[in-house]
Amino acid sequence: MRTSTDIPAVRASGLVVRRGDRVVLDGLDAAFPPGVVTALTGANGSGKSTLLDVLAGVLRPSAGRVTGLPAGGVSFVTQAVPPGALPLTVRRTVAMGRWRGRPWWRPLGRDDRRIVDVQLERLAIDGLADRPLDELSGGQRQRALVALGLAQRAPVLLVDEPTAGVDQVSAALVVAALADEAARGVVVVHAAHDPGVIAAADRVVSLP
């Protein structure tokens, strides 16, 4: 089990991101420590999703840098997954979280399958395991994508709007799962608008 002393804080230093003529992030400095859930807040267009993209390494900033990213990699759950993008069952979708770094010819082992089962139960989608992902409601699909991210067991977990489109009961399951990840020493950062989800976070970083 990882502890918060095993994983350094992820730090953003002087981040500048431009999209065309617009400056989305302007010299942002922020730290994201392990062992706590950090919520990113701010108005639409304030740069929450952009910051997650930079932390995940999928977007290069115009200036500044991110340090402290551990060798174990980053698990990034994004909203930008259209329903038909993953023509898989829910179980196979979540199992994708166990394939990173694994040779294509090596099948998932018993421990991998156990981890997948745990995440399905954790997000209360075990009863949907054999359903195609594109047949699910938006909220069910969101829970499956969060479960995929959890299945990676990465030292850094980034989630864009983790409770988007889910009901209150499902939102509580997602929030509890994020808190559990933080409790095992993971760096957990999510962007949120929901006041209840923000209130459940340990820290809040507000973007102007």
Description of each model-found segment:
Residues 56:
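Helix-to-loop junction immediately C-terminal to a conserved catalytic motif
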Residues 168-170:
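Helix N-cap at the start of a conserved alpha-helix in ABC-type nucleotide-binding domains
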Residues 10, 25-27, 129:
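Conserved structural motif at the start of ABC-family nucleotide-binding domains
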Residues 110-128:
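Conserved ABC ATPase "signature" region
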Residues 157-161:
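Catalytic Walker B motif of ABC-type/P-loop ATPase nucleotide-binding domains
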Residues 149-150:
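ABC ATPase C-loop
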